[in-house]
Amino acid sequence: MRIGIISDTHGSLDPRAYAALADCDHIIHAGDIGGPSVLRELETLAPVTAVLGNNDFDEYGSAAGHFAHPVLEGVRFLVGHKPGDVRVSFAGSAALAPGDPLPDVIIHGHTHVPELKTGPDARPAGLYLCPGAVYRPRSDFGRTIAKMDVEDGHIRHTWVENLDGKVLMEA
């Protein structure tokens, strides 16, 4: 299964981002969606899991909450908008209820800067990811999305690419 990961569209889904996500079986939007029309457009490609960002309000109904915990192909995700929202420590997390299993993948948006960590830097998850931003990027990478291939409970490949399709980081 290929998962497309996008964030910070702020109401403007770049046609190149839409085209880049066309090969995905599921799409995760990590907040600052900017309007229900963005989700409707993404849903023409694949099922969408979305969370609210600090610029999103109640117009999404049940389509987006503050956190999402999808399990896709046996891989557990924790999705929130701000990096601090998805921080998990021994003291717990606002994003996880007591007794919830730890995620395999933590995803956030908000910073507009792509980030991909594995190993000890990603703890307690195996992978920590920010896809960057489709609107107003704050890095020299430009506008970015991420993709992940998962199968039978395993993350096979993860990468961040710019909207020209150039792979910028991978694990």
For each feature predicted by the language model, list its residue ranges.
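N-terminal active-site segment of His-dependent metallophosphoesterases
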Residues: 1-48, 60-67, 74, 141-144, ...
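Divalent metal-coordination and catalytic microenvironments
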Residues: 8, 27, 32, 42, ...
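Short, glycine/acidic-enriched loop or turn micro-motifs at the edges of active sites
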Residues: 11, 35, 56, 84, ...
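Flexible, charged surface loops at secondary-structure boundaries
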Residues: 19-23, 71, 99-102, 123
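Conserved beta-sheet core of the metallophosphoesterase superfamily
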Residues: 49, 83-154, 158
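Glycine/small-residue-rich loop that forms an oxyanion/phosphate-binding "nest" at active or ligand-binding sites
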Residues: 52-58, 62-102
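Short, solvent-exposed aromatic-acidic interface loops
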Residues: 158-170
